[in-house]
């Protein structure tokens, strides 16, 4: 896993948690929770790829890992749309920069998860 991506996750999550978006703060907290969940999932896939022969272990531990993988891609797509929406509706430049970086990070994570999953198939 790229240490830049890890620090990007931590930086964006910290900045998002400091934002005061009024009535939408519940939505933002949900996004933060999903970002954290996505990071953990990506990390676990990366670890599985790094251990040779771990596909059998992954399948045994989670018999429906392909279904879970599909759900994670749906979550990523949903988060991308949410971040795009927030980006369009905010006028605060700090928030715009944060959401632009979050969007870029989502694209990177989607690509990493795709790469990991292809290696596991």
Curated annotation (Swiss-Prot):
Miscellaneous field: Average number present in a viral particle is estimated to be 130-200 molecules.
Compartment annotation: Virion; Host nucleus
Primary localization: virion
HAMAP family: INFV_NEP
Protein name, UniProt field: Nuclear export protein
InterPro entries reported in the protein's UniProt record: Flu_NS2
GO CC annotations, alphabetized: host cell nucleus; virion component
Family according to the record: Belongs to the influenza viruses NEP family.
GO BP: any one term: exit of virus from host cell nucleus through nuclear pore
Function: Mediates the nuclear export of encapsidated genomic RNAs (ribonucleoproteins, RNPs). Acts as an adapter between viral RNPs complexes and the nuclear export machinery of the cell. Possesses no intrinsic RNA-binding activity, but includes a C-terminal M1-binding domain. This domain is believed to allow recognition of RNPs bound to the protein M1.
Keyword terms of this UniProt record: Host nucleus, Host-virus interaction, Transport, Virion
Gene name of this polypeptide: NS
Superkingdom of the organism of origin: Viruses
Record motif Nuclear export signal, residues: 12-21, 85-94
